[in-house]
């Protein structure tokens, strides 16, 4: 409780400093107050000077805790922003796969999982999930093309084993 009071004082004194809002959001998140966590984290995002992939990834993570379709959809938007900035963040891909699964978009969840496994060096699993994704993913979508790319890249590696 005291840390929250101290952070609120700092925010009142320095309202445009995103770090204080982010930290207070983390405190609320650690205490399972997800509504307050997302409120303060959104304030942090609105005050950052430059685009930061981690802020968007964390917001996506916070929104997933609600386990509500509209929040999961919002999480997808934040996680996609994060991945546009840094497409090599395996944890952001993991969170995106969870968000897609929560909204019932299993083919897109499989695609995001394929990307994650590719980044962490799990080539066979990446290949398997890319193949699964391709079966139901919307043809000619960016995810469809990327799934095809992954399959083509990995086919040679997987067939050697």
Model-derived features: where do they sit?
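Solvent-exposed, acidic/flexible segments
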Residues: 13-18, 30, 34, 72, ...
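Extracytoplasmic/secreted envelope proteins and their assembly/folding machinery
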Residues: 4, 8, 21, 38, ...
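Extracytoplasmic and endomembrane cell-envelope/extracellular-matrix remodeling and assembly machinery
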Residues: 1-47, 149, 159-161
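Alpha-helical adaptor scaffolds
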Residues: 25-32, 39-103, 107, 111, ...
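Terminal, low-structured helical/coil segments at or just beyond the last alpha-helical repeat
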Residues: 117-161
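Secondary-structure boundary/capping residues
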Residues: 19, 53, 91, 142-143
